[in-house]
Amino acid sequence: MRRLLTFAVLVCALALPAGVAARPSGTTDGTLSVKDARGIITIQGRGGVIGSFAKGSVTINDPVDGDGTGPIVTGDDWSKDKSETATIWGGTKVRFRIIGGTFRVVVRGRGVNLSFVGKGGVILNGYGTDDDGSYAVNGGDYNLIPAFALPFALSATSP
């Protein structure tokens, strides 16, 4: 009986951390996918953004040092510090990401592709060309990016 009790305690001790690790994190997080956009995409939120653009610039404001990875940008032709917490990078074939914590990301350009997972405010504003790209929210269907500022809150319950 004692062996059975010891075995049961051991199984529970091993199963509990595995169950906690398997639990989905960020169940209130929403997702945004942007494909081949032309215009200005603004994200102010908490979570993670990974993206790239063919030509343009990205401004990343990371107001809290150490609450995530901080901005990581590659392929830029130039950069300029805007403030103590914000930097602008520009060029062609630029890739960027910021994972974790709060941030503000503003991408201006063409050939913009990005993914955002988290919660926050988003503004999509196309340049008014024939093809300003498309976006999808929370795994839904892709819609055309409008030629006017379209603000919305992103979370798991966003339409």
Question: What do these predicted ranges mean?
Answer:
Residues 1-8:
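Bacterial N-terminal signal peptides that target proteins for export
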Residues 23-32, 157-159:
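Short, polar/proline-rich extracytoplasmic segments that appear immediately after membrane translocation
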Residues 127-159:
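Edge beta-strand at a domain terminus
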Residues 16-23:
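Sec/Tat signal peptide C-region and signal peptidase I cleavage site
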Residues 36-135:
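Predominantly extracellular/secreted and cell-surface proteins with exposed
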Residues 8-15:
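Bacterial N-terminal signal peptides
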